[in-house]
Amino acid sequence: MDDAIFKYKTLSEKVFTSKSNDPKATFDHMVLEREIKDVVATSVIGGQSPSIQLMDSRTDLCRTFVVATSRRAGGAVRLRSYGTRDADPFPASIWQAGRATSAAPTFFAPIEIDDVVYGDGGTGCNNPTKEAIAEAGNIWPNRAIGIVISIGTGLENALELKDEPTQLSNLAKFFLQNTSPKNVFKLTVAEYAVRCLTSCEMVHREISEHPDHDILDGNYFRLNVPQGMGTIGLAEWDKLKNMIALTNRYMEHGEIRESKRKMANLLRDPRRASRSL
């Protein structure tokens, strides 16, 4: 975890200060690719090769998947490092999977892998908790889930965008596109960000308010900083210290301390969940 945080600090500055030549993207996807490859090549599993495959048949490793969207077929695609009874591992390199799940519309250009164009998880899968629950059920159909921990990126204050329309009519967009394309692009980015934050919370509410008691019974947790994060933009890599301070303060709240205690107990003994069903 410490390595991941350190790598992100270095990567974020380089990636989010780049500029894209693509009018539909904010940042240069080539810089993102280069930085992901560097992380892979310098990792323990990379062995100095940036093109190591996502698939790993070793049974002692954690099973990992990320979510992307197939632009043509639509819907979420799970890019797995492992095979299941119904699907093979995703046939691509680690850096390609990283690019696919990072290709957020308006921020990075999509990536084509084996003639399929992938973007990020889209506004419906930026919170992939349901995907994770479904995946666990597919792999271990007869086992109870011990614990689910969902980690958010902060809650947005909707009033911060009150002076800007969150949706434009087609006529208004056409007019702006021909008179001020930069402004319409900025509004598109704002719309996307609001949809992402809204969809993430919708998934959380669906799970917490309507849990399947055969799967989740007091073992679902969501950690999400409620205030302050909404003012920090994706490109503001230089505000990581602010994010850390806000998160540390949030994690010390009494309610969160109690949640941490419960999570620690379940992580130490996941069988507690099975016995409680």
Features from the language model and the residues they span:
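Conserved catalytic cores and adjacent C-terminal regulatory segments
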Residues: M1-L277
